[in-house]
C-alpha cells in the first residue's frame, strides 16, 4: 500500500490502538490518515503545525493527542479528533527539535540538534529533566523501562545513558568512527544495538558502554538510518540503499531481505500489532509512505531463524557469539549535565492535555 503525501515526509507514527497513522512533512504540516487492509488510507486531518519542517511526530495520552517537534524549536500538541492546537511551547529547545519518543503514559523525551535531551511530564505540565548529553544532533532515543534509563545516540558518534530517576548522565561511550543514527535495546536488556553511518551495527553490553563488544558489518557500506525491534532476537533495518532487512542478533546474520523502498534511503520505521509495518523515505523527490502486512513473512522468518540456529549449534564454532569479556570502563567521559531546568515558558505547556 502506497500513499502520496504530496510533500517530503520526515517522521511517522502509528496510533497505539486505532488504525491511524500520522506523518510530519517538510513544509510544517501534520497529516493524519485512517488505514485498512482492503482500502486506500483516508486523510482525516491536515494541520499546518509549524513554520518550519515537522521533524518529529508522536501520539501521546493513549492516542488522544499528537505531539510534533520542529527546527523552529517549538513543540506542539494537537487534538486527534478536531485537529485544533491544545498547547504550544515556542521555546522548547535552544536548537532544532529532531526527535520525540514516548517514555511512559505521562512522559515524553525530545532531542535537539545541539545534543540536548529533555523529558516532559504531561501530568506535572513541565520539563522535569534536561541533559546536555551530546555535542551534535540527537539521532535516536529508546527507554529501558525497567530501570528508567534513557539511551540516546548522536551525530557526535557517542551513545549516552541518562538516569531519569537520579537526573544525571550515568554513562557515555567513547567516540566511534562515524555517526550513530539509530538504537534499540535487545536480549532482555542485555544488549544495545546502534546503527551507524558506515552501515556497521555496533553492539554494546549493558553496563559496559565505554566501547562496543561486537560489530556486525554485513550491511556496510550503506548507512543504517532506522532500526525496529521485532523481538529480543530480531530487528528490521532500514538502509541508505532502500533495502529493508530482517537481521538476527547474537548470532548476528541477515536472515533475509524484506522489501526494497525503490533506490532511496529508508529513514523511519514503525510497527503496529506485530504485523503491519510502515516505511517512509526522506528525499526531496520522494513523497510516498508505504505500508506492508508482514504477518506471514515474519512467521516464515522465525522458522528460518530456528533452522539456521540449529545448524550452527551442531557446527559448534560459536563464531558469531558475543563471548568476549566486556572491556573495563576507561577513557574520558563528559560530566553529567545540569539538572532539570525550570523553564517558565514550559510550566503550563501540557495544562490542557
Language-model region placement:
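Conserved strand-to-loop turn within each blade of WD40 beta-propeller repeats
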Residues: 24-27, 69-72, 110-114, 122, ...
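Canonical WD40 repeat/beta-propeller blade segments in eukaryotic WD-repeat proteins
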Residues: 6-14, 51-59, 94-103, 136-143, ...
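Beta-strand-rich domains and repeat architectures in extracellular enzymes and scaffolds
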Residues: 2-28
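Terminal intrinsically disordered, low-complexity extensions flanking WD-repeat/beta-propeller proteins
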Residues: 10, 179, 212-225, 231-233, ...
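Beta-propeller domains
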Residues: 23-42
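Short C-terminal beta-strands that terminate individual repeats in beta-propeller domains
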Residues: 1-4, 42-49, 85-92, 111, ...
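Structural hallmark of WD40 beta-propellers
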Residues: 18-22, 63-67, 76, 85-87, ...
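WD40-repeat beta-propellers
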Residues: 30-35, 75-79, 117-121, 159-163, ...
Amino acid at each position: 500500500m502506497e500513499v502520496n503525501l504530496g510533500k517530503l515526509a520526515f517522521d511517522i507514527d502509528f496510533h497505539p490502538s486505532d488504525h491511524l497513522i500520522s506523518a510530519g512533512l517538510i513544509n510544517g504540516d501534520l497529516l493524519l490518515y485512517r488505514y485498512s487492509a482492503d482500502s486506500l488510507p483516508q486523510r482525516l486531518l491536515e494541520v499546518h503545525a509549524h513554520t518550519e519542517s515537522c521533524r518529529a511526530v508522536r501520539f501521546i495520552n493513549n492516542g488522544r493527542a499528537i505531539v510534533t517537534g520542529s527546527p523552529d524549536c517549538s513543540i506542539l500538541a494537537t487534538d486527534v479528533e478536531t485537529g485544533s492546537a491544545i498547547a504550544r511551547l515556542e521555546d522548547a529547545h535552544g536548537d532544532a527539535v529532531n526527535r520525540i519518543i514516548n517514555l511512559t503514559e505521562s512522559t515524553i523525551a525530545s532531542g535537539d540538534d545541539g545534543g540536548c535531551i529533555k523529558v516532559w511530564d504531561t501530568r506535572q505540565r513541565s520539563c522535569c529533566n534536561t541533559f546536555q548529553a551530546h555535542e551534535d544532533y540527537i539521532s535516536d532515543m529508546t527507554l529501558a523501562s525497567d530501570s528508567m534509563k534513557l539511551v540516546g545516540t548522536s551525530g557526535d558518534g557517542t551513545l549516552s545513558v541518562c538516569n531519569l530517576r537520579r537526573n544525571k548522565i550515568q554513562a557515555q561511550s567513547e567516540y566511534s568512527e562515524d555517526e550513530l543514527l539509530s538504537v534499540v535495546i535487545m536480549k532482555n536488556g542485555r544488549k544495545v544495538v546502534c546503527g551507524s553511518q558506515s552501515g556497521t551495527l555496533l553492539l554494546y553490553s549493558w553496563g559496559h558502554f565505554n566501547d562496543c563488544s561486537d560489530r556486525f558489518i554485513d550491511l556496510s557500506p550503506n548507512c543504517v538510518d532506522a532500526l525496529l525491534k521485532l523481538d529480543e532476537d530480531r530487528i528490521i533495518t532500514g538502509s541508505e540503499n532502500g533495502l529493508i532487512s530482517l537481521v538476527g542478533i547474537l548470532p548476528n546474520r541477515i536472515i533475509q531481505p524484506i522489501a526494497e523502498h525503490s533506490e532511496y534511503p529508508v529513514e523511519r520505521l514503525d510497527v503496529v500489532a506485530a504485523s503491519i509495518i510502515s516505511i517512509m523515505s526522506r528525499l526531496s523527490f520522494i513523497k510516498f509512505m508505504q505500508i506492508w502486512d508482514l504477518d506471514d513473512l515474519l512467521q516464515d522468518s522465525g522458522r528460518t531463524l530456528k533452522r539456521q540456529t540449529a545448524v550452527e549449534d551442531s557446527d559448534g564454532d560459536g563464531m558469531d557469539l558475543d563471548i568476549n569479556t566486556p572491556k573495563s570502563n576507561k577513557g574520558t567521559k563528559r560530566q553529567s549535565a545540569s539538572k532539570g531546568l525550570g523553564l517558565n515558558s514550559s510550566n503550563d505547556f501540557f495544562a490542557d492535555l
